[in-house]
Amino acid sequence: MNPVPPNQNSNGASAPAAPSSGAAAGPSPTFSPLYQQIKALITQSLQSGEWKPGELIPSEVELAGRFKVSQGTVRKAIDELAAENLVMRKQGKGTFVATHHEERAHFRFLRLMPDEGVPHYPESKFIEVKRLRAPADVARLLDLKSGDSVVYIKRVQSFDGVPTIVEELWLPGLIFKGLTAERLNEYKGPMYGLFESEFGTRMIRAAEKIRAVCAGEDDGALLKVAPGTPLLCSERVSFTYGDKPV
């Protein structure tokens, strides 16, 4: 969970089991719409790590042979996966598993852009990193039991030296068992990239609510604004494969 306080040719047929085509064979879909079942099977392979973030997945022809379906069915499934940012098409190269280490991925959840439209990368300063018991509201959002271990992170993100975001993150302690303040300070890439590469957890989508708030004393001090200053509060829950909140 990532609250930020101050800021679908179904042919109607089933497919038989398919032989391997350059990759480990998996079960074939047994009900329609067919392309949705192919999409689900490809997603299972992504989730299991058969194809890792940044890796090239089999071609549409190979996947069609693997699942005994038409190439058009595979293409439609991949189109949806690309629209959901699970894979990326690269002209002349093929389709790759999406990764948070891609430059464009950095702004998928952090949707801040200056007036001139050129993305700026924030600097982060960690204020607090600790392991504690999940409060009831956090446990509910993360589908945990009240009192389960969570990692709490508070940081300030600045653009061009101006503190802009005070961010609080609550992460399931079991998944992020080895996450420490020292590792966060050492790591220089996007935080979601760290979660992906070192903890095997990829953020797939997010549910977000935004509301207007007034700055409190603590957050105001971190943002260098007076208490009562109007701010935007974004409350976000991120989900990984299987729609599991993380």
What are these regions, as identified by a protein language model?
Residues 73:
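Residues in the helix-turn-helix
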Residues 1-69:
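Extreme N-terminal segment that seeds HTH/winged-HTH DNA-binding domains in transcriptional regulators
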Residues 112-116, 189-191:
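Acidic/proline- and glycine-rich, intrinsically disordered low-complexity segments
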Residues 78-79:
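Short, hydrophobic-biased segments on the C-terminal half of alpha helices
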Residues 35, 59, 96-110:
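Short, cationic-aromatic polyanion-contact patches
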Residues 50-54, 83-92, 98:
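Beta-hairpin "wing" of winged helix-turn-helix
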Residues 41, 82-83:
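N-terminal leader/targeting segments and the immediate start of mature chains
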Residues 6-17, 122-246:
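C-terminal all-alpha effector/ligand-binding and dimerization domain
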